[in-house]
Curated annotation (Swiss-Prot):
This is Protein FAM110A. It is found in: Cytoplasm; Cytoplasm, Cytoskeleton, Microtubule organizing center, Centrosome; Cytoplasm, Cytoskeleton, Spindle pole. The keyword Cytoplasm applies. One of its GO terms (cellular component) is spindle pole. It comes from the Eukaryota. Its main location: cytoplasm. Keywords: Cytoplasm, Cytoskeleton. Residues 138-147, 160-171 have a biased composition (Pro residues). It comes from Bos taurus (Bovine). The lineage of its organism: Eukaryota, Metazoa, Chordata, Craniata, Vertebrata. May interact with CSPP1. Residues 117-148, 160-191 are annotated as: Disordered.
Length: 295
């Protein structure tokens, strides 16, 4: 093959086997005619086809500008300025008219009134400290001798803390007596009236056996009074101690039966009383129903 027929910019591509050529689409096997031309972007392709999908002439005539990249923030300092700012400046040496700076240790020792004075060996090791000790500031008071300072530290004692006074505890009388709210207090007259009213209602119930006054009048109050006479009052004559010898001899001579007769009889229990009332009411009911059945 002659050399003239070769394309100067063509690159040799390996030949594909027949089996792969049949399976790969033809547009992939074709090489672009322009070689390494740049592919248009999506924005450029849309700009070229704008007339197909845009109806407004104003939008069709305007051209979309590419998006500008964000501007980077400008540095606050230039490299030279940053180097100048970040580099610590050298201290100016004190001139002949400048006052020498005092050491902070000397000031702290003067303020705290140290007991031990500065030894000459330590002063020779720290010339700046010794110089500061020789020339104290005018505003600082002179340092007292160590003995006075020691005595002062010993004599000055901290003030005793005032003892906390305990809170007065409430007395037993105040703790035992409960405080009633003012709304629950009632006068003695109200209480006595309530008790007397309740006693009257209870007495009326037992006297009339729970019946209405009209029914009690129809049945006869005498029977009710006779039925209520079974209750014996507890307020009987109290047996007082005999003071005479004759009374003692008479009490010793009586028999057991006489002593039982002399005892104050106790009242009928509530259960027995209710049983009698129920039995009496049941008898009245039977007496009413019997004549009606005979008629």
């Amino acid at each position: 093959m002659p050399v003239d027929t070769l394309t100067p910019g063509a690159r040799d591509t390996p030949a594909l086997p027949i089996r792969l050529r049949t399976k790969v689409p033809g547009y992939l096997l074709r090489r672009p005619a322009d070689g390494g031309a740049r592919k248009p972007s999506a924005v450029e392709r849309l700009e070229a086809d704008k007339a197909k999908y845009v109806k407004s002439l104003h939008v069709a005539n305007t051209r979309q500008e590419p998006v500008q990249p964000l501007l980077c923030k400008q540095p606050l300092f230039s490299p030279g300025t940053r180097r100048t700012v970040l580099t610590p400046s050298r201290r100016a040496l004190p001139g002949p008219g400048c006052r020498p700076q005092l050491d902070l240790d000397i000031l702290s020792s003067l303020i705290n009134l140290c007991d031990s004075p500065v030894s000459p060996a330590e002063a020779s090791r720290t010339p700046g400290r010794a110089e500061g000790a020789r020339q104290p500031p005018l505003a600082t008071p002179p340092r007292p001798p160590p003995s006075i300072a020691a005595v002062r530290r010993v004599d000055v004692l901290p003030l005793p803390a005032s003892p906390i006074q305990p809170c007065p505890s409430p007395g037993p009388a105040a703790a035992s007596s409960p405080v009633r709210p003012p709304g629950l207090q009632r006068s003695k007259s109200d209480l006595s009236e309530r008790f007397s009213r309740a006693a009257a209602d209870l007495e009326r119930f037992f006297n009339f056996c729970g019946l209405d006054p009209e029914e009690a009048r129809g049945l006869g109050v005498a029977h009710l009074a006779r039925a209520s006479s079974d209750i014996v009052s507890l307020a009987g004559p109290s047996a007082g101690p005999a003071s005479s010898e004759g009374g003692c001899s008479r009490r010793s001579s009586v028999t057991v039966e006489e002593r039982a007769r002399e005892r104050v009889p106790y009242g009928v229990s509530v259960i027995e009383r209710n049983a009698r009332v129920i039995k009496w009411l049941y008898g009245l009911r039977q007496a009413r129903e019997t004549p009606a059945a005979e008629c």
